[in-house]
Amino acid sequence: MEDAQEQRESSQAELAKKHPLTPLKELPEESEEEEEEEDESSAGALRESDSNNSIMGKMKMRVSSILPASLSGWFSPSSKDGNDALSSPANLRQSQPRQSNGRLTTKRKRGRRRIMLAEVDADAADDLDDGSDAKGLNYEEVALADNIAEHDLAAEDEQTRRSEYNVFLLRKRAGAVAAAGGDEDEAEEDELEEDDEDGDEEDDDEEQENLQQSAAVQTKRRRLELETPVNLPNMRRLPLLSSTPAAPLAAATSSSSSQMYKGVSHIAPHRRNHLNLYGSQRQREPAYNFFTGNEAAEGSTGDLPHSIRRSLNIPFGGSSTATSYNNSLSSLPNHKRPSLIGKQTHRRDLTMDETGTGPAMSSEEHLNHLLRISRTNNNTSNNNNNNNNNNNVIETKTRRSELSAAAGGCGDSQSESDMNEYHDNGEGHDGLRPSHYNSNSNLEFYGNLQSSKSIFNRSNTAAQQSHRNSTWSLNSLTQRRRFNASIYGSTSALSDSRLLSGSASNSGSASASSSPFYQGRTTFGGNSGNNRLFSRSNLSSSAASSMLGLNSAGSSPAHQLHASMTGGIGYGMKAVDMRPSDSGSLAETSVGQGGSKKPGTGLSNTTMRILNLLESYSTPLIDAKRMGSSIKEHQSSRQQRQGTPATPYLRSTSASRNVSVPNHINELAELRSNKLLVPTMQQLLERRRLHRVTQNSRDVVHSQNVRAGGENNQEKPKPTAPYVAPIDQSANHTQHTNKMRSRLSHQTRNKETRTAEEEAPPPLDLPQISFPDMASAPKFDLIIKPTVPVVSKPSTTDPIQSSKSSNTNLSTTNSKQMPNFLANPQPAAPIVNFAANGNVSAISKPSKRTFTFSEPTPLSNFQENCIPKPKINRKYTFSAPAPLDDLRITNKQSQPTINGTPSSKEWECDTCMVRNKPEINKCVACETAKPVASAAPVQAPLPPSTAAIDTQSFVGFGDRFKKSTTAWECDACMLSNKAEASKCIACETPRKTVAPKVNNFSPLITNAKSNEWECSVCLVRNKVEVSKCVACESAKPGATMALPATSNIAVATPSIITDGFGDRFKKSATAWECDACMLSNKAEASKCIACETPRKSSTPIANSSYPSINNNLPAGSGFDISFTRKANMWECQTCLVMNKSSDEECIACQTPNSQARNSNSESALISSISSSSASFSGSLSRPSSRSSSGSTSTCGSVCSGSIVSISSTTESAKALSAKKVPPKPDAGFQQLVAAQKTSTWECEACLAKNDMSRKTCICCEQMMPEAFNPAATTANSAASSVPKFRFGFSHVKEVVKPSVETTTTPAPTSAQFSFGFGQSNQGKDVADSKKTEAPKTFMFGVSKVEEPKTVSFGTGIKETTATSSTEATAPTPAAAAPAPVQFVFKAPTTATTASSLTTTISTTSNAPALGGFSFGAPSSSSTVSSSTTSTSANPAAVKPMFSWSGAGSAVSSTSSSQQPVAKAPTLGFGVSSSTVTTTTTSTKVFAFTPASGLDPAAATSAPAAGAGFSFGSQSKPATTQNTGTFFFGQPTAVAPATPTNPSVSSIFGAPATSTTASTSVSATTSTSTANAIASSFAPTSTPQLFGNWGEKKTDLTTFGASSGSGTTTTPSFGWSSNGDAAKSNSAAVGSAAVPSSSASTMATPIFGSSSMFGPSSSSNNTTSTSTTSLPFGSAATTAATTPAGGNAALTGLFGNVGNSLAGVGAPVATTPAATAAAPLTNIFGNPTPVAAAAPVFGSGSTIPSAGFGAPAAAAPLAAPALPGAFNFGGATAATPAASSAPFVFGSSTNEPLAKPSFNFTGSAASSTAPAPAFNFTANTAATNNPSGGDSTPNANALFQFSATSTAPANIFAFNPPAAGNSAQSSQTARRKIRAPVRRLPPR
């Protein structure tokens, strides 16, 4: 042991040398002696005590030597005892916690350490005065002080916390010390006391000096000894018990009190001591110094920095003996429930005597010591705070005197030191309970835990006494392990501190009643009425002191006992009453009055402490029970509120409460307390309401029951008045001005005032009122009539009661009988009657109730005889109501009552159901004649069930809707007509002679009519004359059809209401159902009226049957007849419009009359989908090219079929064509339309009506369609067919009869864009007489292709038979003049003379068919304008106008005498996979720019079919170039080139600058070479649409990609399709550029075709590739093709600059060297850089400036360019043979470089193509690239959104090029864009 001590001494000396900064020096005279004494005494004590010498001491020394200094210093609770520790103030501060922990044995070790420290600091020993101070020093403390002064010890915090709270070890050690015996303790305590007395004088000065010295920086020193083994698991955050604010007073009182208590220092371990709870050095955090107002001064004293972390400040008065303290030191984790009887008695002096301090000091001396300590401590902590110190000391002295007086008055003989300590909380240790009488370790430990930053740490104790508020407890809620309802928003929690401390019922604490929100006591609503426990008279100092112990776990631990001068006022709540007691006297007995009475007269102190401990110990169950009990505890307060009239919240004494509160009130309060255990705000309000209303009412009832006489009732208001509104008295509320209460009570006061006002009228004398009918006849008029027993009892006594009493009676009685209706105690009449407005005057005189829905029943006056007067006989039964009175009956007769029962005398109009007087013969509303059988028929058939009903008074509501017997119902429109009406007033259907039906409801259900027959299918009753059911058209059983022809026509008028509504939708027996579309068709229909599917196994009814049917039908034979064909009408099979029989074509869609066509047998248009080709919906008019063999219908793609019907012209269609279409009914309208039509023709572009004499539209100058102008077509020259712009169904008349032989190429009928179902008559191919081609118009879905009936939905693989190709061998020599395609919304069916197929043009001549805007497939029969080239005729495919992807006019100029059948299957939406043995050019439609006409340059190359709108890639034959770019406005210019793979540029922003022909978006012409099987979805070298934005890709499968062999189609859905250069013929989409010298027809596509909307179709130079500029951006400009295959620059519209890049090694076209293919200038800002043309909308098309004012530039060698109709400024280049495009908005047709009208941004520059504005993505290719080199795209176009442009002019290009000549350089400035900066949110 001594060896270890020597080692410690040596190590400490070394540390002292190492750390010279330890300022705590010990006086030389004291140091040696005292330390030796201390060592000896402590050693002796250790030897005496226990095995502590051997076990504890050695273990501690060893552990301390093992552990590092930081750990040992923190963990070893310095165990030196109070003699040494308390000798000097500095030591006191360090040893106080240790001593309060009661470690007696550790004194020796401390003494040893002090001796060692004194030796170490011997040089500075003379600074100290006496040994007592030196003994107070502890090396651990000094080292810790050094550590704290120098460092924050952040790393050691956790270990410190753990060791600091290691109560278990400390208790263990203390237990060992306690076992050693009390003799040594007493001796040490005596020694400590002596030291204390000696050092009293010196403490003040020396402590400050020592503290300053210690505050001087002291280096860290290892603590060589750890006095207790460190058990880290036990040291982790032991649970804290009390949240009492930290008490700096511990330090203040350290020296005196600890000396006074020699063995046990009860000074709380203040942080300033640097000792933790167990005497070991504390953490660096000082407790809040409550003595000093200046916290900063503490920093200068070397104090620990303030920390929010709560620190433990155990009150020094916690326990007197070491043993008791040992118990209180039980570690919290292992803490057993402390004994209910605390170790300490309530008498501090006795405790001191027990601990050996009794003889040493009196309480006065103790107080002096405490004052001295506090003063010294204050001086030490802050030299500058002398004023504060003095004030604190003065206050302490003052309170000491007060406390001494109070304690003297107490029987408890509580020491003043306790009171002083406790009341020095604000100064010394705010929140320490100096006298925890029944406190255990939990209480002390938790009671002294508080936040250093607590806002309630107040240095002014006087203020604290008055300002103790629940926020203290709220602040420490987290510190207590107990449920606190205040956290959870309970109203009673904040208002009612009872819940803040469940323990506080028996022992009051001021905090319990203090409000957290305002100064003063917490009260519900601002009043303290709910808090019965706060009363100075109720609380005694002893109870308060006992409450102090509970306060740690009790009500509000932060609230100290503010003992006032009178004996300590315990601001605590009483504990739960553990014994039966009178609620009134409980407060008095349990809480002593005035300090003269001990707490709990019937309970001993031990019992009280036990109960308090039980109460303080918290478990969830206890907390839950406590909440309920706390409510019960306040029954007395509630009783007082309820009973005290004047001051419900001010209760003087329980006796006065008992006097004022009746017994039943107490009972009710008890009852409510049981009901409302935990009152919510709603419950509290309800309780208040019940108190006002229900209880008062019950009281009144009770009083009335007790008192028999009315005079008693008159006297009743006196006792009743408090009950009526005890809470509502304004005077009472003015006294309590707290916020919540005053607010709530204010409402109550208002109610009370209103109640008083309402009482002014005379009282309601209910007893005189009797309601005999109340029980028997309930009323539905919302009038609650009080029954007689309700009021009779109180009222019989005296009708003249005082207003208040009578009102009270009313409310009471009603509350008992109708409690739900009592919302408030207002005793007005409305309680009984909802209708009453609360005025009693209404009851004083007889008045009618206001809210009755019928005749108001007058309330009787005071006479009872008035009651039976209103006889309410109305019964709400559905039978006839009994008449209430004569007046009502008369009114009911004269007028239907509200329930809708008409008077029997009135007659009801069967038409409009208006009831008319009997004398009126016509309905006043609809003038329908009065029924003949007026009332008798109506009444007679009434079933017996209705006989009981009083017919006069009640007629069913449904009767109003019954038909009149005389009225007859129109079978067509179901409208009831008057009997005299011969025909229906609505639809004029003639009346049928049917016997009038009896207007009964029941017979309809029960009895069958003799004159009706019931349909066995739909159970609908039909009239006898009807041969078939009107609903399902089932034949009448057992009856032959009277009208065989009309059997399937619902001629029979539908029966009246008897016929079910659903019967009309039932299938007729004769009708047949279409297998394709499931539509029921009439029996005579040979094919489905919707999808034209032929009827299976049914011979078609002769058309003659239709007229016979119609002739047999009576006029106006019913509603169904309106849907039947008239005799002289025929129904268009395409649009189902009825046409006159004289009309040869449909007036709506211009589909030829199938009958007429069948008679001609030229083209069977009634093509129903055969079984091979599935029809999806109604068939559109399709040209049936019988001779054409490879017609394919691909659903949604190639077929120009309507969306509704996929009709492919098949053999069945041919068979059907033989039969005549029956004439349609409704001839009048048709004739009118026909007459108008014959006299006028409608411009399909602008829909203007023009006189037949005009050949052009008067509005838009669109040329007259061939349909109106058959003469326009020339026999030998293929007149450019103008597709008609029709929103309806485009119908192209076949101008040429099939009889016409070859050599006459009929003007190619332009496929018309018909949104509906348009039939397009194909121009007969003169060259191939066998083939008739009817261009199909705008089939949304699929057009039926004739022979190879292959209906492919996704990909139309066109298998064209070799026959067509063989027949296609003979090209027509006649030069094909380009037919201008008109702007037709319907797909223009360009009838190719050569190919008769609508969609797939299987023509002998190589005429690519351009499908006009068939969403699926354009049935564009390309009119092969067989322009005789040198070797072969180059048929110019007529471009459909405004085919959304209208197949570009694939102009197949086969220079060699090849006969590739250019079959243009327009694969709509999908794929036109044309597997044609011969080269078929299928132009897909639905490209907004029609497919560019392909120009097979090589002789071998067949014309590429531009597949319109292939989402994916289009397959092209390698030889021919397929330009099917799905441009919405971009024409793909196919430059004549060798059949090398054309690179397809995908649109949508990436201009695919592919040398090959760029396929316009939807008009991607996929030309498959002969024997090239175009397998759809086969990879083609076409960049995907949508996918590659300008990226050139090969082998893309289009959406339904028609894979052509070796052909690269650029399906560009992007805006720019770069016109390919060399290899492919650069034909603009929709413009057929024929490179051969022969006139190249250029159909300007509408909206997509450059020809429309201002794409100027410019005839190019010598090779005369006519390039059409596409409107809307993608102008496929055929670059001027050099002889070596010059690139045609295709400028896409909408910023789509089509770069026609000259393909390297582009083969020379067979035509003479085409120097420059005229580039198509895309309109809308797509400049075609090739020719100098002012681009429309900023796109300068080089030669032809297309669109909106772009002048048409005449190419040097002008092939006849097909001018696009409806060019918005697109000037058609004036080619020698070019027909001027009709209605170019600003284009001068023939002027070579006309200024573009509507040239919004395009400048008509001759040489340079101005950059197109709005060039969304099109690249303008550099125009003049003589050789096959790529042309540089001109990017000057504004709005080239993703166009790759070399010029920087593209402002909106995502990366506009920095350099380059821009036509619009002024717009090249880029917008500044701020670099993105992340904005961090504020911290």
From Swiss-Prot:
Zn(2+) 3 binds at C1015, C1018, C1029, C1032. Residues 29-41, 182-209 have a biased composition (Acidic residues). Its cofactor is Zn(2+). Transmembrane segments: none annotated. The keyword Metal-binding applies. Sequence repeats lie at residues 1287-1288, 1315-1316, 1317-1318, 1340-1341, 1353-1354, 1415-1416, 1469-1470, 1511-1512, 1528-1529, 1548-1549, 1586-1587, 1599-1600, 1613-1614, 1647-1648, 1653-1654, 1672-1673, 1694-1695, 1724-1725, 1737-1738, 1748-1749, 1768-1769, 1785-1786. Zn(2+) 1 binds at C909, C912, C923, C926. A zinc finger (RanBP2-type) spans 903-932, 962-993, 1009-1038, 1067-1097, 1126-1155, 1237-1266. GO terms for molecular function: chromatin DNA binding; nuclear localization sequence binding; structural constituent of nuclear pore; zinc ion binding. GO terms for biological process: chromatin organization; chromatin remodeling; DNA damage response; mRNA transport; NLS-bearing protein import into nucleus; nuclear pore organization; positive regulation of transcription by RNA polymerase II; protein import into nucleus. Zn(2+) 4 binds at C1074, C1077, C1088, C1091. Keywords: Chromatin regulator, Chromosome, Cytoplasm, Cytoskeleton, DNA damage, DNA-binding, Membrane, Metal-binding, mRNA transport, Nuclear pore complex, Nucleus, Protein transport, Repeat, Transcription, Transcription regulation, Translocation, Transport, Zinc, Zinc-finger. Residues 1-17, 420-433, 627-636 have a biased composition (Basic and acidic residues). PROSITE patterns: ZF_RANBP2_1 (PS01358), ZF_RANBP2_2 (PS50199). Part of the nuclear pore complex (NPC). Associates with male-specific lethal (MSL) histone acetyltransferase complex. Component of the nuclear pore complex (NPC), a complex required for the trafficking across the nuclear envelope. Functions as a scaffolding element in the nuclear phase of the NPC. Essential for the nuclear import of nuclear localization signal (NLS)-containing proteins in a Importin alpha/Importin beta receptor-dependent manner. Required for nuclear import of Mad. Plays a role in chromosomal organization and gene expression regulation; stimulates transcription by promoting the formation of an open chromatin environment. Belongs to the NUP153 family. Contains FG repeats. FG repeats are interaction sites for karyopherins (importins, exportins) and form probably an affinity gradient, guiding the transport proteins unidirectionally with their cargo through the NPC. FG repeat regions are highly flexible and lack ordered secondary structure. The overall conservation of FG repeats regarding exact sequence, spacing, and repeat unit length is limited. This is Nuclear pore complex protein Nup153. It comes from Drosophila melanogaster (Fruit fly). The gene is Nup153.
